Amino acid sequence: MNQGKIITVSGPLVVASGMQEANIQDICRVGHLGLVGEIIEMRRDQASIQVYEETSGIGPGEPVVTTGCPLSVELGPGLISEMFDGIQRPLDRFQKATDSDFLIRGVAIPSLDRKAKWAFIPKLSVGQEVVAGDILGTVQETAVIEHRIMVPYKVSGTLVAIHAGDFTVTDTVYEIKQEDGSIYQGSLMQTWPVRQSRPVAQKLIPVEPLVTGQRVIDTFFPVTKGGAAAVPGPFGAGKTVVQHQIAKFANVDIVIYVGCGERGNEMTDVLNEFPELIDPNTGQSIMERTVLIANTSNMPVAAREASIYTGITIAEYFRDMGYSVAIMADSTSRWAEALREMSGRLQEMPGDEGYPAYLGSRIAEYYERAGRVRTLGSQEREGTITAIGAVSPPGGDISEPVTQNTLRIVKVFWGLDAPLAQRRHFPAINWLTSYSLYQDDVGSYIDRKQESNWSNKVTRAMAILQREASLEEIVRLVGLDSLSEQDRLTMAVARQIREDYLQQNAFDSVDTFTSFPKQEAMLTNILTFNEEASKALSLGAYFNEIMEGTAQVRDRIARSKFIPEENLEQIKGLTQKVTKEIHHVLAKGGI
């Protein structure tokens, strides 16, 4: 422990002298109030400290005490359904302890509840050899999540004691005799530095799709479990709703939602909606699998920078248990702005638009902690982290540094489009500018698992949309009626794909989520209409006759998005109805 004194205060940056024994990334207690800060730069005996609380009223001469430890999070039972701030302070217990709706400065509250007792069930017995990552036992944390207590990193040896029963997170639950003869006494909780990624046995290639229930994503721009995706878009394009939809319905075990520098009412929406929503995979409340990290725009800027790392470290902990985890960061642009502010106050050489020169490497550090891995431990298991980051470029300009650095790393780009949002087409993901580099892997995985021709259907549907885009300029110049019959059909089918398939109402109880079998049935109906109508045109039928003769079945295809999942056979039955009605048109015309 080293004590210095403040010489300069500049917003969230405090410079202290007499800190020659301190290290970079040490946590400090700043001023008489004991504010939490982290050393981010050392020059001789002077330390530059990033303070995670409001610094007003702090002045030169006040003491600074280092703890000698890096910024770390507590990992153990009690994380699920909890809401933390950027440095893992529990907001509900903070409010009860301080009796204030605002963050009182200098208050230290442990992240995990020290009074709560958890029922621990051992899975190993005394005398067994254990290594780091082995599962010692379990705690049923919620109705959905079984919390697996693991041997901490760098601990191995013989299990000499393990107890069943109800324990707090600090009680000694097991003892391990290590190779040097020392006894390690372990509890239900472990700590981990947030800026250091948790070690794994092996990184694997992600192949299994993350099913989100959003048709435009699952069909055209899928992300895998263990993948990384970015959602850039201008104000009002629907970034937050896309993030909320994925958090609600993605087929993962755990969701970490990081509200980083965005509006507080968005976190309020999460708190109001999530407890009432039922997870379609488990039948339980979605909050039973969710961890919330709230660092809204009215909270200290410096803590935004920590919130992303706090979230990804908690995600890695659950991944090491063998769970699939999705982490949503809304928005990484606000996090980058916090980096820019601290860099400016440190008087570092600025890069593009004032962002620090190391912006790209910091963004890469975050997204590279996602992935599919084989975890440590003698019991073989796999875990995944899927990282989905919203980016808020000013004015929707994706050429700005945060978006460009993000796109260099992630493999999925869901580009939200202001003109689509203005036309009330939601989700406003532009199918011509977005891309997914997982498309081939996911397509072959689904073809193999479902024994279907899914990837071929997706290719055909995208070809229709691209053909529509190439015809649009001709239509604007000379009108729709001047096109050939075949091109008029292409325009009509493309409109069906856009309005009846890609458009989705997040606030409709049925349309908000579409399972994969339902997506396939809906797309098959539209493509069958295109195929049969195209054949009819080649046999001599007229476009207008086909459209009039199939008006009823096309209306039913359009309404199929509102048919509940349990009535899937109704949607599948429309395929034969389409063929029958087009044959009827041909017969009526004597063809």
Swiss-Prot record:
Q: Mind telling me which GO cellular component terms the entry cites? A: proton-transporting ATP synthase complex
GO molecular function, one example? Answer: ATP binding
Which positions does UniProt annotate for ATP binding? G233, P234, F235, G236, A237, G238, K239, T240
Locate the coiled-coil region(s) and give their ranges: none
Q: Which reaction does it catalyse?
A: ATP + H2O + 4 H(+)(in) = ADP + phosphate + 5 H(+)(out)
Q: Which EC class is the enzyme in?
A: translocase
Q: Which CDD domains match?
A: ATP-synt_V_A-type_alpha_C, ATP-synt_V_A-type_alpha_N, V_A-ATPase_A
Write down the EC number: 7.1.2.2
Question: Which controlled-vocabulary keywords does the entry list?
Answer: ATP synthesis, ATP-binding, Hydrogen ion transport, Ion transport, Nucleotide-binding, Translocase, Transport
Instruction: Extract the InterPro entries matched here.
Output: ATP-synt_VA_C, ATP-synth_a_Xtn, ATP_synth_asu-like_sf, ATPase_a/bsu_AS, ATPase_F1/V1/A1_a/bsu_N, ATPase_F1/V1/A1_a/bsu_N_sf, ATPase_F1/V1/A1_a/bsu_nucl-bd, ATPase_F1/V1_b/a_C
Source superkingdom: Bacteria
Instruction: From the UniProt record, give one GO term of the biological process aspect.
Output: proton motive force-driven plasma membrane ATP synthesis
Q: Does the keyword Translocase apply?
A: yes
What this protein is reported to do is described as: Produces ATP from ADP in the presence of a proton gradient across the membrane. The V-type alpha chain is a catalytic subunit.
Q: What's this protein's family per the entry?
A: Belongs to the ATPase alpha/beta chains family.
Query: Could you identify this protein by its name?
Result: V-type ATP synthase alpha chain
